[in-house]
Each structure stands twice: as C-alpha cells, then as structure tokens.
Amino acid sequence: MGIEVCVKAASGAPDVLGDCPFGQRILLTLEDKKLPYKTHLIDVSLKPDWFLAISPKGKLPLVKFDEDENWVADSDLIVGIIEEKYPEPSLVTFPPEFASVGSKIIGAFVMFLTSKDHANDGSDMALLDELEALDHHLKTHVGPFVAGDKVTVVDLSLAPKLYHLETTLGHFMDWCVPESLTNVRDYMKVLFSLESFEKTKAAKEYLIASWAPKLDV
C-alpha cells in the first residue's frame, strides 16, 4: 500500500485536515519529496478503535512506510526515516547547526498565547527575543530559507509553527510580528506561498476553533 499517515482531523469536521503543526510537518516533508501517501484523518474527540489498537496512547502523527512495517510516532523520528529511506531530493539542513534555528519560537509563542499576565510575566518579550534571533539569522545569511536558497527540514518544521503563531495571536490578541522584523515577515510569506504548504495547511477557522478551548474563550 505504500506510505500511510495518520494525522489530526479538524475540530468539528472529521473529514477535513486538522491543525496539528507536527502532522503538517510530516505532510510537508512527503510533499516536498514528491512521495505518494495515503492520509487517515483521526477525530481526536472520538478516536476509532482501529487507531487505538495501533496507538493506545492516541499519539499523532503516525506513519507506516510499508504494509509489513510498524507505525512510527514522533515527528523528528519520522522525518529522519523519510530522509534516510528517500534521500532525493535532499532536505537535510546544512550546516547542521542551522537545524536548531528558531527551535525555541514554539515554546515562547505558546507561553505568550496562554499567559494570564503577559504584560508582567515577560512572555511577550521572550517571544520577541526569539523572533529577533530568527530575524538576525535571516538577515546575516543568504536566503530566502534558513540554510540558503533551498527549503530544508528546518523550514518545514518552522512553517506550521509560524502559521499557528500568526493566526492565533492575530485572532485572540490582535498581535502580529512587528514590522521592524522585515526578514521574519518576508520569510513567512515565502513559506506560506509554497505549493506544499498551501496543500497541507489547515483552514484558519479550524485552527482557531482548536485553540479556543485551551484559552477558555
């Protein structure tokens, strides 16, 4: 049957692709590798028995690379296996130290979004610091991507997270990436215009619907 992928379905719409950034990262990788795959959308509010049989803890995303292989969890591990099994075209980030660029943005973003007192707890400045670090990297290295003129795994990891950041902070907090961070803003435009991103992104309304319960709104 080839590659199969289990990813989150949209909140309230079990037949529509959901908002999980880690699931989108896997789909982006498969798309940019031009690999055929079958998608299973999993309603996390009503997980099917067959899914719980292969993932008792309900972990997503999951990938199976062949019919006689086991399902694999953890997006880092999955991306590594994809690169190992299907090395062309290469998505390896080089030099290796660039692979961690922007890695702290997701944590800072979630802390800021869920903060009850961001004006005083420093979560706003923590996020700004991480975005400024990304902006500095993009400004001082040839782009438009983190490691040069070609998209690599670090970009495919950052793209869904920056999409969540832009969508949720804009909707719930009327906040956006400062205009002074021109390199980050341009980088986001490039990422969001990728054909693979357009094909694998969740609609903004489903992303917002998924975050709302976590924010008590």
Swiss-Prot record:
Record keywords, A-Z: Cytoplasm, Detoxification, Oxidoreductase, Transferase
UniProt-listed SUPFAM superfamilies: GST C-terminal domain-like (SSF47616), Thioredoxin-like (SSF52833)
Reaction it catalyzes: RX + glutathione = an S-substituted glutathione + a halide anion + H(+); L-dehydroascorbate + 2 glutathione = glutathione disulfide + L-ascorbate
EC number: 2.5.1.18, 1.8.5.1
Entry annotated with the keyword Repeat: no
Pfam families (UniProt xref): GST_C_2 (PF13410), GST_N_2 (PF13409)
Biological process according to GO: ascorbate glutathione cycle; positive regulation of salicylic acid mediated signaling pathway
Membership in a protein family: Belongs to the GST superfamily. DHAR family.
Name the UniProt record assigns to this protein: Probable glutathione S-transferase DHAR4
Lineage: Eukaryota, Viridiplantae, Streptophyta, Embryophyta, Tracheophyta
Gene behind this protein: DHAR4
